[in-house]
A protein has these predicted regions:
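ATP-binding/phosphotransfer module of carbohydrate and carboxylate kinases, centering on a glycine-rich
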Residues: 1-153, 193, 261, 269, ...
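Short, active-site-adjacent cap segments at secondary-structure transitions
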Residues: 163-166, 205-208, 233-234, 243, ...
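Short, acidic, Ser/Thr-enriched surface-loop or helix-capping motifs
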Residues: 113, 166, 237-238
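Short helix-capping/turn signature of helix-turn-helix
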Residues: 38-39, 115, 177, 213, ...
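Glycine/GP-enriched mid-protein hinge/lid loop-to-helix segment characteristic of carbohydrate kinases
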Residues: 121-123, 131-135, 181, 185-203, ...
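Glycine-rich phosphate-binding loop and adjoining helix at the ATP-binding site
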Residues: 118-144, 148-222, 358-369
């Protein structure tokens, strides 16, 4: 039975770099929107200065954004050198995006505008063995209901677990849910709502949310988002671009082996990281070692993890041992991310991150032990501080950016 627990390839430019090359028009268009997200009101001249472009280039970009209804003029403002200029602002509330997160046990639907403001958020739980068509029908109904309530929605983004094969529109493997690999999400949703519909891998969605909306030191060159929840995954943004690979399935950190003689994973590999530090694994360890922390009967993995974290904070030694084991494996994952991608920052998110105050010291200890000083001293490792689930946030951000890359589709929606 479904239960309601609700409540009411993306590019971001580095802070001062743009390009006058026509091949980068879409990137520059996204960058202008990003500047207006940060500044609220800004002149063409100030945008040109911040991006390092000519004012003529910015004028052309802004003209397209105004035609799309994304940007409007707000009258005279004080610009550089105290000169008066025409101000620009985002028409945020007139351009809303639905973000959808599909996960094991639940899906979530949220409404955002292009400035990142959230208007609504609802979560629907379902048993992991629930029939796929029942879950898909519930997702579609919730999106239709949301469209009825919010009339300014211009696009929909869906984040799904990976490895997601973007050209085929399906997930290659959904651990714990093997029957879902036959579901073609693209075919199921693309023509359902009469809105542009985009699908993104959940790790990539989290990376996008952190890149666009995370409170991190700027500029960043390479960001790694490390998703540790019902599954384990990651998303990498380097130089402003998502690292996707030929099929869109790059950076599957959860299926990197940490024990070549370990248990066989559903993906076919042995000793996958996901088998050692995901929420289901933590729940399993808790049942074996600290059952007194758990409720009798069925309990969601994330709720069980929270119970273990609370017990550990209270000094329960067995709970602390469970947390240390999970934290060490997250640390091994960070070691792999650092050696593979040399990021400025690793952001750990999803349900396990709720124990960040306990986990982070353990993770950093492992990294310090296993990474050379020249690398580990240059990477920042932190827990996501976003108030909205990064995966849900990123699903909406991905849809926003895709529309900015294709103005003709955007204008067709607005007509």
């Amino acid at each position: 039975m479904l239960q309601n627990r609700g409540r009411g390839r993306l590019i971001k430019m580095r802070d001062t770099i743009g390009s006058n090359n026509s091949d980068l028009t879409e990137m520059n268009r996204s960058a202008v929107v990003k500047i207006l997200q940060q500044r609220e009101v800004c002149s063409r001249a100030d945008i040109a200065k911040q991006m390092g472009l000519t004012q003529a280039s910015i004028t052309k970009i802004v003209a397209v954004l105004m035609e799309m209804g994304i940007v409007s003029e707000v009258g005279s403002i004080k610009g550089s050198g105290n000169r008066r200029s025409i101000g620009l602002k985002l028409n945020a509330d007139r351009n809303q995006i639905i973000g959808v997160k599909f996960a094991r046990h639940m899906f979530a639907v949220g409404v955002f505008d292009i400035s990142g403001k959230i208007y609504s958020h609802i979560e629907i739980e379902y048993p992991i063995e629930e029939d796929q068509q029942v879950v898909l029908a519930s997702m579609k109904k919730q999106i239709h209901d949301t469209l009825q309530q919010y009339k300014n929605v211009v696009a929909i983004g869906l984040a799904v677990p990976g490895p997601y094969l973007q050209d085929e529109g399906r997930i290659a493997v959904v651990t714990q849910m093997p029957s879902w690999h036959n579901i073609n999400f693209l075919n199921e949703f693309k023509d359902e709502f009469n809105k542009p519909f985009f699908i993104v891998h959940d790790g990539n969605a989290g990376a996008l949310a952190e890149w666009w909306f995370g409170e991190h030191e700027k500029p960043l060159h390479t960001l790694a988002y490390f998703l540790v929840g019902e599954g384990v995954g990651s998303g990498i943004i380097e130089g402003g671009n998502l690292l996707l690979g030929v099929q869109g399935a790059a950076s599957e950190i959860g299926h990197i082996s940490v024990d070549v003689k370990g248990p066989r994973c559903e993906c076919g590999n042995y000793g996958c990281l996901e088998l050692y530090c995901s929420a289901p694994v933590m729940y399993k360890l808790a049942k074996q070692r600290v059952p007194e922390c758990l409720l009798e009967g069925y309990q969601q993995n994330s709720d069980a993890c929270n119970a273990v974290f609370e017990a550990a904070r209270g000094g329960n030694k067995k709970a602390l041992e469970v947390v240390r084991e999970i934290g060490e494996y997250i640390g091994y994952g960070c070691v792999t991310l650092i050696n593979a991608y040399n990021p400025d920052i690793i952001v750990i998110g999803d349900s396990i991150s709720r124990g960040g105050d306990l986990l982070l010291p353990i993770v950093k200890e492992v990294v310090k032990q296993r990474i050379i000083d020249e690398l580990h001293t240059k990477v920042q490792i932190k827990i996501s501080s976003l108030k909205v689930d990064p995966t849900l946030y990123g699903a909406a951000a991905a849809a926003t950016d895709k529309l900015l890359q294709m103005p003709s589709a955007f204008l067709a929606v607005k007509e």
